[in-house]
Amino acid sequence: MRKIIIDGRDFENIEVLHDDLKDKLDFPDYYGRNLDALWDCLTGWVDLPLTLVLKNFEFSNTFLGSYADDVLEVIQEAQEELKDEFKIIIE
């Protein structure tokens, strides 16, 4: 299973968060940089199986506020949808 690490200390703002996700998860150029587009790409674009490691997630909350929780919710819902093909680890 492929493993990708995302570090919450890197997310100064929402744009940087989405740019990092796009780059590390190899989303298409037309990725919309919003929660709906995140869901679409996680459930229909990324190569599976995949483990996504969210390091230093508490920093995401510091920089992004409640938006970090919204992103986490989308990622968790994708994990439920994709069963054993997509896993998240929060550190």
Curated annotation (Swiss-Prot):
Quote the cellular component terms of the Gene Ontology held in the record: cytoplasm
Q: Where in the cell is it found?
A: Cytoplasm
**InterPro entries in the cross-refs:** Barstar, Barstar-like_sf
Coiled-coil annotated residue ranges, if any: none
Q: Which Pfam families match?
A: Barstar
Tell me if Endoplasmic reticulum is a UniProt keyword of this record.
no
Q: Does the keyword Transmembrane apply?
A: no
User: Sorted alphabetically, which keywords does the UniProt record give?
Assistant: Cytoplasm
Assigned protein family: Belongs to the barstar family.
Protein name, UniProt field: Putative ribonuclease inhibitor YrdF
Lineage of the native species? Bacteria, Bacillati, Bacillota, Bacilli, Bacillales
- State the encoding gene: yrdF
